């Protein structure tokens, strides 16, 4: 065999799969190294994809030509749109997936991508010559040669699991950790630290009293993750269930805190703020009498259930005893206990926006090794790292996404500019341009860029063009079509909105909250005929996109103006221009932070914590602005 590659990806989690697929689809000879081919894209925790802001990231991955959205649609067993009561900037898709089918769907994709080879092994060392990565060595004593390497090792780097006082080395339950690799990277001056995450018990569904729980059903409308997928749901759609903890369960948990690794000093690492363990919840919120739990199926052919909201590293017997105090779990049987895991991560401020290391040329980092948490955040980083690894091999301009282009852009900019002191999770609140970053228009924002890059093929690009044309036709029709008051007022009263005193444009009516494109079209024959011209299977998607553009035109325009103004600061390049230690007009903190991050632009400098507006003014003056 030939062990020489353009790009090697270490780790086949969600970041690694997207990175390897992107590099190979762009034409790089690529190798994906994983410990276990039967665990590619394993959902290590919750068997679900998407959620608030995370769903938008998956849509963006899909718009760029990635696969997470397609695999999710193919293996979803429940689909919902979250935040429907809010505006479209806040809508987020989420799906429960069949855990095992998700793995096999991804594996089928990977095994059929030209230029992509999978190797089952464990990497122990990267090879660096003259400040540039050139290869790696594995525990099978195989030496690989590579022009670029992407590290996507997840929680496996020196992973250590905790259940009560029991500690067990590993990257996941019953899977070995990866040793020596962190140290082989750190010896080249790259800083690293430790983080912690956790997962709940897995329950035997035959022991659950479902009649004592509330049901949570999915939705069966046109929404999906992939812009390519117009088919109905592939798998049988299943229910989830909800219930609450109670004071009896809390007392059991409190009595066990002395044996909790989180509270007895056994775990020193920082865990995810927005996904706390059940023991953290009862300590942080002592007055709260109950906490909601979600019981979620792991697949359509298994009894295994995931208990969302009950992550724990308490001793197994305490976890079981506490759960048995909840009526629905009074006869509880589990497949395995919850556990916590500590792992190594690398400070992401040591990376460029391409996710390439600033210290080792052609070495890229993506996913949980950068201090993030979540499959979606990992996948978003993975596709960007894979694209740029290919570009480093074959030439071209670096591919980055701005904060007004994508949640992926917000994510990466936050990582490389601000760094992390706890596992980073994406929220809509982290994006200052979230009206521009809606779930409905990820294809409009990103697919053309990916097409020019060569990652998006003709079929996807043709779908984008036809959708864009249809949406523009609808919006233009409503702008130009006039309606007389006498002909529409009866309809307006039927729709529960105020009659007109004089004629107006159709777009003005659609801007009313009671009016939608579909309900007003029933009373405007010319508009109905215009909509009937749309024979595309994606008609509902097209109508939704057009309606959002109409109803939120003012907000979108205002945010676009703000983004464009700030974009001017993005054009002022400062990397390598200043000796920050010598700039006494800057604050001490600003000098330290600017020296460490070495920002590319004035705009990036302005987002560094500790760099004040007055510091930015100093840099602008020194830049001749």
Swiss-Prot record:
Gene3D superfamilies: FAD/NAD(P)-binding domain (3.50.50.60), GidA associated domain, C-terminal subdomain (1.10.150.570), tRNA uridine 5-carboxymethylaminomethyl modification enzyme MnmG/GidA (1.10.10.1800). The keyword Flavoprotein applies. GO terms for cellular component: cytosol. FAD binds at residues 11-16, 123, 178, 368. GO terms for biological process: tRNA methylation; tRNA wobble uridine modification. Pfam families: GIDA, GIDA_C_1st, SAM_GIDA_C. Its main location: cytoplasm. Coiled coil: none annotated. NAD-binding protein involved in the addition of a carboxymethylaminomethyl (cmnm) group at the wobble position (U34) of certain tRNAs, forming tRNA-cmnm(5)s(2)U34. Homodimer. Heterotetramer of two MnmE and two MnmG subunits. This is tRNA uridine 5-carboxymethylaminomethyl modification enzyme MnmG.
């Amino acid at each position: 065999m030939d062990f020489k590659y353009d790009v090697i990806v270490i780790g086949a989690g969600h970041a690694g799969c997207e990175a390897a697929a992107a590099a190979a689809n762009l034409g790089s000879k690529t190798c994906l190294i994983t410990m276990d081919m039967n665990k590619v894209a394993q959902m290590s925790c919750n068997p679900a994809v998407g959620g608030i802001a995370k769903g938008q990231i998956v849509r963006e991955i899909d718009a760029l030509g990635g696969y997470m959205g397609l695999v999710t649609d193919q293996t979803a067993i429940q689909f919902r749109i979250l935040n429907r009561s809010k505006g479209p900037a806040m809508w987020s898709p989420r799906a429960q997936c069949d855990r095992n089918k998700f793995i096999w769907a991804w594996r089928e994709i990977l095994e059929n991508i030209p230029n992509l080879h999978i190797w089952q092994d464990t990497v122990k060392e990267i090879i660096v010559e003259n400040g540039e990565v050139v290869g790696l060595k594995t525990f099978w004593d195989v030496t690989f040669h590579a022009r670029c390497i992407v590290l996507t090792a997840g929680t496996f780097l020196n992973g250590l699991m905790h259940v009560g006082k029991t500690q067990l080395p590993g990257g996941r339950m019953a899977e070995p950790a990866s040793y020596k690799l962190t140290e082989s990277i750190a010896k080249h001056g790259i800083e690293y630290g430790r983080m912690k995450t956790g997962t709940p018990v897995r329950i035997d569904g035959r022991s659950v009293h479902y009649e004592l729980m509330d049901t949570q059903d999915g939705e069966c409308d046109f929404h999906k993750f992939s812009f390519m997928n117009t088919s109905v749901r592939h798998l049988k759609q299943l229910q989830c269930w909800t219930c609450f903890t109670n004071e009896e369960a809390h007392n059991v948990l409190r009595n066990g805190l002395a044996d909790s690794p989180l509270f007895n000093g056994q775990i020193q690492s920082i865990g995810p703020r927005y996904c706390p363990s059940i023991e953290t919840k009862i300590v942080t919120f002592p007055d709260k009498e109950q906490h909601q739990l979600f019981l979620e199926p792991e697949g359509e052919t298994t009894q295994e259930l995931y208990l969302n909201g009950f992550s724990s590293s308490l001793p197994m017997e305490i976890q079981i005893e506490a759960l048995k105090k909840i009526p629905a779990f009074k006869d509880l049987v589990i497949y395995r206990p919850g556990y916590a895991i500590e792992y190594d991560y690398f400070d992401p401020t040591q990376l460029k926006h391409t996710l390439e290391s600033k210290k080792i040329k052609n070495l890229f980092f993506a996913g949980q090794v950068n201090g993030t948490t979540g499959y979606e955040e990992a996948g978003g980083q993975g596709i960007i790292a894979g694209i740029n690894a290919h570009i480093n091999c074959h030439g071209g301009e670096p591919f980055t996404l701005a904060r007004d282009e994508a949640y992926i852009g917000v994510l990466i900019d936050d990582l490389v500019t601000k760094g992390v002191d706890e596992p980073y999770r994406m929220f809509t609140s982290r994006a200052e341009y979230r009206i521009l970053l809606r779930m409905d228009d990820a294809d409009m924002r990103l697919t053309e860029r990916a097409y020019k890059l060569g990652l998006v093929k003709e079929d996807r690009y043709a779908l984008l063009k036809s959708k864009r044309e249809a949406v523009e036709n609808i919006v233009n029709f409503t702008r130009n079509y006039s309606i007389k008051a006498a002909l529409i007022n009866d309809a307006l009263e039927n729709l529960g909105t105020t009659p007109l005193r004089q004629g107006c444009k159709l777009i003005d009516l659609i801007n009313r909250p009671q009016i939608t494109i579909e309900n007003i079209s029933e009373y405007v024959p010319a508009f109905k005929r215009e909509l009937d011209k749309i024979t595309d299977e994606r008609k509902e998607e097209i109508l939704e996109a057009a309606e959002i553009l109409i109803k939120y035109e003012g907000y979108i325009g205002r945010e676009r103006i703000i983004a464009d103004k700030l974009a001017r600061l993005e054009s002022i390049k400062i990397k390598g221009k200043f000796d920050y230690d010598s700039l006494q007009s800057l604050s001490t903190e600003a000098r330290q932070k600017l020296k460490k991050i070495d920002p590319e632009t004035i705009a990036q400098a302005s987002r560094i914590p500790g760099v004040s507006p007055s510091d930015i003014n100093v840099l602008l003056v020194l830049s001749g602005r």
